[in-house]
């Protein structure tokens, strides 16, 4: 069964074991954080699942789409000009279905169209730092799709571990940038959101 899963993910056992080793090493600190979060929310015996996503800290900072766009283009353009240019194209050419509306599905996703070398991104942007992070995440998938443009069609299906690496990296780079100017309360909110989201990846 493991061999089949590894083949499907295009991953060797050594890579999987390295990932599990990193997870095991980080787990004690992550558990301590969630115990502390539980205490902060009034739970003495750990954090119940129903409060996993309960917000902590306080952030009144919101972003317009224009501010989110400028932040992402500047940050990712400096990191990788090709990624910054792809993001500019995504914003300017209408790749992104940005806002929530009646009848629209919740959440977010990205779908690539190989023949046209474009992607389509759906988000429900309401202006929070988490929404900007979600946008960065989905545009990470779009950039991964863009990088596959010279591959044969049969090689363009990205296995989940690789697909989530690109998008999670984008979130991490963005959060690192936001932390540079965050107040202590905003810092707590950003870090909590980041850690909580990682339990789902």
Segments from the language model and where they lie:
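Cation-handling catalytic/transport regions enriched in His/Asp/Glu
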Residues: 1-201
